[in-house]
Amino acid sequence: MDNYYFSAKAYTTLVEAMPGKTFTDATALVNWQRGTKSAEELDFMRKAARISEKIIDGLLDRVEPGVPKNEIAASIYSDALRGVDDAWGDYPAIVPLLPSGTDAAAPHLTWDGRSFAEGEVTFFEVSGCYRRYHTPFCRTIFLGTPPDDLKRAEAALVEGLEAGLDAARAGNRAADIANALAAPLERAGIERGARCGYPIGISYPPDWGERTISLRPEDDSILKPGMTFHFMPGLWMDDWGIEITESILIRETGPAETFCHRPRKMFVK
């Protein structure tokens, strides 16, 4: 009974139209059933991943000091909708997120008319979309020379990301990914309280997450082959933020497969 597009009015209309009937709350029932993807769904997600890569490649070429952020947002949409080869692009469920400087201390911020500036960090959270299937992908760009604390955080984050990917195996728990990520961060003196991922697949606005399993220490859900997640260990600190993420597939054996294939690092220009 809890859904973006199932309103209180819709519920009362059903009750009035079907007197004497009992309605059972089946919130998220369908979401749980679609957690394991078919071969065709995975093919769609791999095509979406090629679009995600194209978007990030374009950002690495175009982002420079003095370029207005809205122009970069427009280029993201252009790459997303033009697609790659036979994978035409659809509109993603979430708009491009690209906060810079102190704005990057918080997730989920979009853009304005300001220009990119020397000495600022920007993370880009985007996703290609093919036949409504998504593969979110985040990378971070620093214009200039990054400070030492940001470089130390990058190193710990990448170490945690690699550890989490190795822990993302069939039979392990969602919590195992979160705990693997947390260990290098804790050694670096970084506390991170937020979840670090969620299931993905087919979606419409306003969200590309499936709202079921949550990659956090408290979630003991068992990982199964065919499950797909956005593993997104972002850091949002007092006056900066960094995101280096991967969309992943739980395989029959071995660690997770990443849908996208780009260096796991903060790009410096």
Q: What is the predicted function of each stretch?
A:
Residues 1-269:
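Active-site neighborhoods and metal-handling regions in enzymes and metal-associated proteins
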